[in-house]
From Swiss-Prot:
Catalytic reactions on record: orotidine 5'-phosphate + diphosphate = orotate + 5-phospho-alpha-D-ribose 1-diphosphate
Superkingdom classification of source: Archaea
Spans traversing the lipid bilayer: none
InterPro entries linked: OPRT (IPR023031), Or_phspho_trans_dom (IPR004467), PRibTrfase_dom (IPR000836), PRTase-like (IPR029057)
EC numbers: 2.4.2.10
Swiss-Prot/TrEMBL cofactor(s): Mg(2+)
Family that this chain belongs to: Belongs to the purine/pyrimidine phosphoribosyltransferase family. PyrE subfamily.
Pfam families membership: Pribosyltran
Protein name in the entry: Orotate phosphoribosyltransferase
Biological role stated in the UniProt entry: Catalyzes the transfer of a ribosyl phosphate group from 5-phosphoribose 1-diphosphate to orotate, leading to the formation of orotidine monophosphate (OMP).
Organism: Methanospirillum hungatei JF-1 (strain ATCC 27890 / DSM 864 / NBRC 100397 / JF-1)
């Protein structure tokens, strides 16, 4: 039996859309990558976790920024048997006020992202993790749009590893 590549699985899940979109970065684009919909599939989540672990196993816990990064972090956590961490985008008005859910102080944390464009979400996650005492050196993105995230993260001494590049989804 031939195993589908992650690229093929994302295309089959209709994770790539064409039209007029405003991205989380604020940029306008004619292409939208809908990883959040794609990762509702257990098969795609398992494939992503397996792919992440072919690139990195040297971490104590895996983190994701809410909302898109959380199911990715959970899937990598289950596949690696290592804890996961949730990074909230904003503080709640009740309960515990921390943006970080999980133990990160002094730990090597792998940050997983659904899609990287400018790198803004990853930078936010890295800053939150580092301010809580974590060591962060790597970000793995399911899809990188090649629109500056790599360069932005490099400025923070972070290596960005995309599992798929947007042009590979479009051009094959």
């Amino acid at each position: 039996m031939v195993t589908a590549t992650l690229r093929e699985m994302l295309i089959s899940a209709e994770a790539i859309r064409f039209g007029d979109f405003t991205l989380a970065s604020g940029k306008k684009s004619t292409v939208y990558i809908d990883i959040k919909k794609a990762i509702t599939s257990p098969a795609i989540l398992k494939k992503i976790a397996a792919e992440v672990l072919t690139h990195s196993t040297d971490f104590d816990a895996v983190a994701g920024v809410a909302v898109g990064g959380v199911p990715l972090a959970v899937s990598v956590s289950l596949a690696s048997d290592k804890p996961y961490v949730i990074i909230r985008k904003e503080q709640k008005g009740h309960g515990l006020a921390s943006l970080i859910i999980g133990d990160v102080a002094g730990k090597r944390i792998l940050l997983v992202e659904d899609v990287t464009t400018s790198g803004g979400s990853a930078v936010f996650g890295i800053e939150q993790l580092r301010s809580a005492g974590a060591v962060v050196t790597d970000v793995i993105a399911v899809v990188d749009r090649n629109e500056g995230a790599g360069k932005t993260l490099q400025g923070l001494d972070i290596t960005l590893t995309p599992l798929v590049r947007m042009q590979d989804l479009i051009n094959g």
